[in-house]
């Protein structure tokens, strides 16, 4: 090489491998030393040598050259181990999905990065002349990332949306990919191909816009005479030396530089490498340099402000088109880099945080008051410190002090023992970097179907008050309680209600019909009554033919009923214990329009019937009236059926048990209609008392009468009662004969003879004596409606006789009750009908036996669901009433869950027992729960949760563990097994004494109560039933394991405790097991036996627990929950949405949009937003400090200078992160163009510019000086597109965008284009004013320079201006130190303006 270059003795011989960067540096040194012509000869020789060597050795690539890194195996294994632990934590609910994702990215990113760093040393040691190594290291072909994929591992890939796929590709291309890895790679490759195409065009367009903005900027003068400069401090530690050198080299000094008394640099001297080295060694004062920002010319630039030309080492020539060079040098790396990066195929890059490690082993100590507990980004517990925290680590011989910067996370606890090099703190990365964070939504989908449960309060998000989007206020768990759902679409409303029980054998097993089952297998006092559903015997729908329809009355039959709730509006508060069976009356009487009627079945809230209780009632439509009136019973003096205090309130039926007295039978009653209007006192009445009116007479201003007849007006307290009686008037003959007929009913044959009309009346009449005045009197005869009452029908032996039953059956009697007392006026509310008679079904039993031990019956509704068809049955059990009922307190809030820890008490509804003084030391609490239909937004399909006893693992006390599925075959022979698992009634225990049951044989272990509950030393043998607690909207269905109809998705785990119940808990964890409590996986409930699945305790027995499987999902505060509490989720439904920040991936492709956003000043971007805000802030503050005229001037000046520096630094950062070096002055020329305009504000009135007009800053300053008055303006940031459309040349604007609009506007305004730029001249075919074409322009302008300009006489303003603007280092330094300290970039500190 030495020989080839030149035969010179003084050249130094270098023997080392050089890459592209080193060659660049070499060439620039050669140009400095030898000049251009000589250097090109040297380079030609170098090229020849290179080609010769390459062809001689035939550098090529073989597959054997790809050497895998030896340490890869154990690194990958280690990462997999960490991922496995992470997966476990996520499964236990300690870490949520976003934290898991972040952590797994960091685990694999760190592994991948480590392998990448190992790569070069590995090649260098094992095979330095490996062709792969040579090519990638020299940068000739491929980069480190690609080689890393060939011999390291591909790592994490992005999907087309730019999201990370959390399955890393562990293989490299040398080993070959597995099928899954190949498919994931294809994602990345496709993203690469698409992005390359899109981004190349983006980069091209960016270049076009950049050139458009600055095409007219040409070097036209040698010196503009400015004294301003920008300070760069060599002693600033924040700026790396490389960037410092790059900033200064080729610039021109704006001021002399002194080193003590000695001047080491003169003004207008260009800075070479020698001068820079002197600056660095001497650490001089800040150096003031000239930049394009400080140039005073408006539409061009001078040589000294631009500095050296990048092509050769001298000052730039006059006439050089530096604007176009600047635009292209910024745009070009974009195109190049898009093409280059993307051959790595969408490999994901993340960032890792900086760590502080312990210097030695020892105990760590710090002040706990200064830290706050928090969670790290990965879900680990940590402490956050807000100020500098001093941490001491005491080892045996030495004490180390470590300072932890503010906003760091401390990962260890106080007094913890740490080992050397253990990570003790994490410095928050990215507080000052440009890596823009973007907010990403991550949806979490549920893995299983089930019921939603929250363990904390949840806010309604304000914009969705009525929807099901909720915001979490604090970190908590969401639980999905497992359970299948069953939708029933045939019945219009779902019938599953509170306190439902379902019999085990009432569902058809293998498509058998249920009719035989329900009669023969029903050995308990379990009564079914149900209306008939005929037909549909195909498809295994049960046939109810043997259960004939009951409840026949004279007029109506129950046929094809539909069953409704008491309220059909599902969202209303439902009546809990009843529903109405609607039916149509068979003979619709003369097609009258009647409201639908139905049988209402009511069960008392505690579910207990005494004798002669009303089981159901039926409001017969024929006893229904729309008008007011009075009832009279058949004969005068008939005893009232009801005692007075037991009158039933008809509307809003409460829990009533009226004591009915059946002393006398009433076979008919009478109803005397009348029209009644109740009016306020103030109303003006248009009729007189005792006058006779016709139909539709106006009574008041707004009311007309519906019937004609006699008017009676009575004044009562604060109101007027207006009655209209219809009927005939009779004037009697003899007074004494009539008197006894006052207000009585007269049968058809006993009509008065001596009235004028002595006709025979065919109907009953009601006679009233009326005296309008003392002398006048007459008899008013009113028509009467008569109602016949049928006798009570006794439906004895209603239900089929049970074979094994020893007692009599229940019987039902029909009784008619008149709802209103004798002679009581009945007031109808307009539009509602009045029911006069209610037909009731009375429940009775054991009438023949004198001493029956059974005092009450327990009733509940039973639902049977087969093939989606739901039937409702009533089940009645007879029993003695000597058991203590556990009743629910009357609590409006509904039953909630009882939690163990205080913090989770969301909705607690305690239940109390009869033994109020009971102290329960550690016994399982037994609670009653409710069942409810779930409210779906879909009104057509109601869904409900079904609990089946399959998947129910039973661990018997005496036998070994049996899986329930194994027992299935033997269940027909041995009834005991089905008993232990058939789920008992909800809530209160039924009477077990007389419980002759095929299902519930008395096989529960008798327990002596004193052993566990101290019930005032009351010793009893108690049958323990399995108690259930469901949360608010649960639904339970007992069913057989063999049934396929019911979804068997309810996982129950039977968990047994040992006999010595108290000593059985883990010693460390004093768990108190309470019903409804949630357990995480592997929590220790009993000694030595951690529970294997997470879930909720729903049954507590003395020797066992049943746990309903549940899956916890952790959600941090700010997450949104998408479902209501208790709603049913299906697999794959959206459960939670997390919003988290992630740094955008570092690609130039992602970088290009960043550069574009900065240059276009787009508001979506945080950079320009902060700049805009900052500009406004400076404008206000400075104006406030300095007053108006100076404030605007200096404010705009300062603002513009500061924002320019900020923009330059931001753009440089993006390119530098990609390893692209662009000289600052190119970016400065562009930034100068987009910040050189100011907006005239409306504050000051000036005659020159209109408010809102955009003018150049220098023009504004000059006009202000010329006019000697202040022009108010403020700085604005224009984007490059806007700046291109706001130039001095309309031809250039028209050739860029919106041609017609620009030309039309220019024509209307009469704009003049001076053809100063390149584009205008190209469009018009003239000579462009650069290079040789510049000479003529220069020649012309010299002639103009000789004409002297007249200066205005007053120079005070100019002098003051100079004082402030040109000798204002102190002032500006003051401003920058006080007002501009919040600038976000590091380089500011060394790149401040003077």
Swiss-Prot record:
Sorted keywords for this record are: Chloroplast, DNA-directed RNA polymerase, Metal-binding, Nucleotidyltransferase, Plastid, Transcription, Transferase, Zinc
E.C. designation(s): 2.7.7.6
Q: Which GO terms describe its biological process?
A: DNA-templated transcription
Q: Which GO terms describe its cellular component?
A: chloroplast; DNA-directed RNA polymerase complex; mitochondrion
Task: Please tell me where this protein is predominantly located.
Answer: plastid
Q: Which Pfam families does this UniProt record tie to the protein?
A: RNA_pol_Rpb1_4, RNA_pol_Rpb1_5
This protein's record includes keyword Plastid: yes
UniProt subunit comment: In plastids the minimal PEP RNA polymerase catalytic core is composed of four subunits: alpha, beta, beta', and beta''. When a (nuclear-encoded) sigma factor is associated with the core the holoenzyme is formed, which can initiate transcription.
Q: What does this protein do?
A: DNA-dependent RNA polymerase catalyzes the transcription of DNA into RNA using the four ribonucleoside triphosphates as substrates.
Family the UniProt entry places it in? Belongs to the RNA polymerase beta' chain family. RpoC2 subfamily.
Q: What protein is this chain from?
A: DNA-directed RNA polymerase subunit beta''
